[in-house]
């Protein structure tokens, strides 16, 4: 087993501070803790990606963790904007939401979400999803991966 030495760059998009903190704490269990950026809604996420991220010449996030139901701009709209943008479309997006409604799940996958996890989340399942996404997308992961 090989462990990368580069920390993941993760963008958490969630209007609930308690949920965002829980997600951040779950990420901290990685071999190399990630660089985490948090924003409270979809509009802030797109502003961040365009100002701080790809368009500013800074490395794009390795992973976006996205809530669906937020003020100003919800997760569905953010996901659509990300997937329509040639500079952002390759970033894996995991939907993390309290909704287990079939239309939300199907809609997220139809919008090309990389994964869908309901909150409250099982930490082992969350870690497995993050590891799998890093293997699948070829990111230099901070979590253990097989060589």
Regions found by a protein language model. Name each.
Residues 114:
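Short, glycine/charged-rich "phosphate-handling" switch motifs in NTP-dependent
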Residues 87, 99-103:
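Negatively charged, flexible loop motifs adjacent to catalytic sites
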Residues 67, 97:
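Active-site residues of response regulator receiver
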């Amino acid at each position: 087993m090989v462990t990368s030495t580069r920390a993941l760059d993760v963008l958490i998009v969630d209007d609930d501070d308690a949920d965002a903190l829980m997600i951040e704490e779950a990420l901290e269990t990685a071999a190399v803790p990630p660089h985490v950026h948090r924003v409270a809604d979809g509009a802030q996420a797109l502003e961040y990606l365009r100002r701080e991220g790809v368009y500013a010449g800074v490395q794009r996030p390795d992973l976006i963790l996205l809530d669906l139901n937020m003020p100003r701009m919800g997760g569905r709209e953010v996901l659509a904007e990300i997937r329509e943008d040639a500079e952002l479309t390759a970033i894996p997006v995991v939907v993390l939401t309290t909704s287990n409604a079939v239309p939300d799940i199907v809609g997220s996958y139809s919008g090309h979400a990389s994964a869908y996890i309901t909150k409250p989340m099982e930490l082992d399942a969350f870690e497995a999803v993050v590891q799998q996404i890093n293997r699948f997308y070829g990111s230099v992961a901070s979590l253990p991966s097989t060589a």
